[in-house]
Structure formats: C-alpha cells, structure tokens
Amino acid sequence: MSQVFQQDLTDTSVRPGGLFFIELLMAEHFDMPGRDTMVEVLTKYLGPVDCFDHRRDSAGFAPQNYKVHYEDTDADIPPTLMVTNCEKIDKPVLDDFDRSQVWDCPNVDELLAECQYRVFATDMLASGLAAKERADMLVKYVDALLELYPSCKAVVFGPSRKFLSRESIENHPDKEVTRFMYYAVNVRYFSIQGTNDMMVDSVGMSTLFLPDLQYHFHGVDPNHVVFHAYNVL
C-alpha cells in the first residue's frame, strides 16, 4: 500500500530567489582540498575567482565573471560561493516524503546507506543575477565540485530535494545551461487519496525567480504530464 502524506501548508522553506544549496554525499571522510587546488578548479569552470576565505571548516569564493548590480551604491559585486568541511551525517538525508519523489536514481537506497559523510555547498548574494546567468554559474559550480570531490557518489539539490548519482550528472548529454532543470528542478507526482485525481508539480525554478508548475488531472497518463512539464519548463 502506498504511503500517505499530508501536505504541510505552513512550510515556507522554499523562498523565491533563495539560496541554492547542494549536499555532496560520500562514503568516507574527505578533507577539503587546498586553497590553490580549489581556485584552480573553480577557475577552470567559472572563470577567475577570488578566494576570500579558506579555513578548516569552510571556504569562500567570489566568481568574477558574475556580477550583481546594486543601485544604492552603483556597484557591481560578485556573489559568494561557499563550501563547508566534510561532516558525518547524523540524520537521514531524505525523509520519507523526499524519498518518495526520487525518480532518476534507481539505486538511491543503496547510495543513502553507503554514504555516511557529506559536504554542503551554496551560493549567497546571488538572487540579483539574471535567471540564465545564475543557472549558468550554478551548473558550472556543480561540475567544479564533482572534480574537487572525486569520492562524491551522489548529490542532493535544494530546495527541490532532487537526488542524482554522480554518474547521471557526469553522463548527462546536455552540457548547456538548460541542464539546470535536470540538476535542480524536481517534477513530482502524487495521487490524491480517496479520489481518482492526480497531481504533478515542479519545485526548483523559483530559485531563479521563474514560475514552477502544478497540474491537477485525472484520466491522463501521468508520464505524459511529467513529460509536458519538463517541456514547458
């Protein structure tokens, strides 16, 4: 019998334009790469970066090819890319609801059991970037992080909770900015208890101040609706 979930109408964790964060999951502890190595790899993918912080527990970078204009000071300032130290996972990475919406990783349970450590990475002060510019920065940031952390086996993207294996990211045929939709946007499927109705929605596009979608329907193959959602996005 399928598990029944109750929607939390008080949840405000998904905020348009909010932080984009990811979790890099790995089986063993992995020390943060050295400052020079991180600058070299990030520069390879993102262009010139300034490293303004590199300590045991975190590192911070400013990608110079991406600038947010602040009208009050008439200044163009790069956003911030942050990486935390590797830590032991002390509670489930995905709750039951998130796990029910993993569609692109058949061995998700195996990876969740194997990966006992994680690294958090996020952007900050990036909401002022144009949607395409921010998406471009973020997908390249993901590529750089996978090179910096070769033991990473899977990635969880927030706030959509999209779960992808390392291989599916590296082997994805789309190498353009549009892969943001594959990485960071989760199209979810629900059947509504006590009815023949179904719902498909997306979560993740609001990070770029772009609209997410919701379909409420019955009598239609949900796979067709999911396909339509990705095409519309």
Segments and roles (model prediction):
Residues P16-G18, A62, A75-I77, L112-C115, ...:
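A short, structural micro-pattern
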Residues G17-F21, E110-G128, G204-Q214:
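Glycine-rich, often proline-containing surface loops adjacent to acidic residues and nearby aromatics
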Residues M38-D50, Y141-Y149, A229-L233:
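Hydrophobic, Leu/Ile/Phe/Ala-enriched alpha-helical segments that form helix-helix packing faces
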Residues V83-N186:
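Internal, hydrophobic cores of structured domains that mediate oligomerization or house catalytic pockets
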Residues F157-L233:
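Aromatic/basic-lined ligand-recognition segments
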